[in-house]
UniProtKB/Swiss-Prot annotation:
Protein name: Deoxyguanosinetriphosphate triphosphohydrolase-like protein
Molecular function in Gene Ontology: dGTPase activity
Species this chain originates from: Rickettsia akari (strain Hartford)
Domain HD: 62-198
InterPro entries in UniProt: dGTPase (IPR006261), dGTPase-like (IPR050135), dNTPase_2 (IPR023023), HD/PDEase_dom (IPR003607), HD_domain (IPR006674), PHydrolase_assoc_dom (IPR026875)
Record keywords: Hydrolase
């Protein structure tokens, strides 16, 4: 039974374009299915989490990460008697707007777009789901419920100060109450993202030999798990050891999140979702001790993994690809597919830049590499191939 402060699908604020609900799914289950069936969701399997897609079959990509986040979000929401369907759905959609090549790709595209109001993957997720996906005859986008869109756009909390152009534009027709906190389910999805990525980036980084178990001594609380497991299982393999460490880490983080959130709910005597949205802090949270550990772990990953020689070298190449593609399309829009070129307002540089950014952001790693090799290479064979495939 849902708590009184849960997001009840029967009491949803509905969709921008009115629809008759189905009898066999609730509104949030319907949204989950719509997201899974988008082209953008399928493309996530070929988009970088930390390691480029072709570097290894077992490294996580944006799709596997999103699935892992959704399982954590669903479990936490279910334990708190919240809508597990809503938490799962928001988690599945939270990375849809990411560029190829992960954060390196986003930084590169944002730099290209600095004269055209920049680029934000969070705003791009909203744009994909409300405009760019073309699946229905009656409207653009996939017409999700208010609660799902709110949860996606407030992934990092209330939006104050300068508001992204597309978010502001969409908000005029469907007010997402940007200045308030999102539902408890959306807050769960956000912290499930933190739990998943810090745990699994550690695992993948050890698998890629960017860091080793000795490096984890910098993180005392994780090193303690390593020590205990080695003491208990004398001949444990390295691969099994990191799996067990990640398992313990995730259990600790989830247990802590549940405990602190229950404390917050009881302290505030929350009885409805309105109170959650209008608190002056996020109701779903870790303890202060665990928040400090998460910050420490993020700093460790940033310094030892994301800024490592291997990742930095790859990031430089990825930056070159994104910026190179942006330049060639800006120089000649005829290199764009016809259906994308038609979206550009004639002789409007701003419109051209925005359409090109949308096109590049939707690329997978491998398509961006292929496109760069064909459009930015002087190899004569690529020029001949270009004539057949793109003109």
């Amino acid at each position: 039974m849902l708590a009184s402060y849960a997001s009840d699908p029967l009491k949803s604020r509905g969709r921008l374009y009115k629809e008759i609900p189905t009898s066999y799914r609730n509104e949030f289950e319907c949204d989950r299915d719509r997201i899974i069936n988008t082209n953008a969701f399928r493309r996530l399997q070929y988009k970088t989490q930390v390691f480029i897609n072709h570097e290894g079959d077992h490294y996580r990509n944006r799709l596997t990460h999103s699935l892992e986040v959704s399982t954590v979000a669903r479990s936490v929401a279910n334990t708190l008697n919240l809508s597990s369907d809503l938490a799962e759905t928001i988690a599945l959609a939270h990375d849809l707007g990411h560029t190829p090549f992960g954060h390196a790709g986003e930084r590169a595209l944002n730099e290209c777009m600095k004269e055209y109001s920049g680029f934000s993957h969070n705003a791009q997720s909203l744009k994909i789901l409300t405009l760019l996906e073309k699946r229905y005859a009656a409207y653009n986008g996939v017409n999700l419920t208010w609660e799902v869109l709110e949860g996606i756009i407030k992934h990092n909390g209330p939006i104050t100060g300068e508001i992204n152009e597309y978010i502001a534009e969409y908000n005029k027709q469907n007010d997402l109450e940007l200045s308030t906190y999102a539902s408890a389910e959306a807050q769960i999805a956000s912290l499930a993202d933190d739990i998943s990525y810090i745990s699994h980036d550690l695992e993948d980084s050890i698998g890629a030999k960017i860091i080793d178990f000795n490096s984890l001594a910098e993180l005392k609380y994780i090193d303690q798990h390593v020590f205990e497991l080695k003491s208990k299982f004398k001949n444990i393999s390295s691969s099994c050891l990191i799996y067990e460490v990640v398992r313990k880490l995730m259990h600790e983080l989830i247990t802590d999140l549940l405990w602190q959130t229950k404390e917050n709910l009881n302290k505030e005597k929350i009885i409805n979702i309105y109170e959650i949205r209008h608190l002056n802090y996020q109701i779903v949270d870790f303890t202060e001790k665990t928040n400090d550990r998460i910050k420490e772990t993020k700093k460790f990953l940033h310094e030892r993994v994301y800024k490592s020689n291997k990742i930095t070298a790859i990031s430089l190449k990825c930056t070159k690809i994104v910026q190179g593609l942006f330049k060639v399309y800006m120089d000649d829009i005829n290199l764009l597919p016809v259906n994308w070129k038609m979206l550009i307002d004639s002789d409007d540089t701003y419109s051209k830049a925005r359409v090109i950014a949308d096109y590049i952001a939707g690329m997978t790693d491998r398509f961006a590499i292929q496109e760069y090799n064909q459009l930015c290479s002087l190899n004569f064979n690529n020029i001949l191939k270009l004539n057949y495939e793109y003109i």
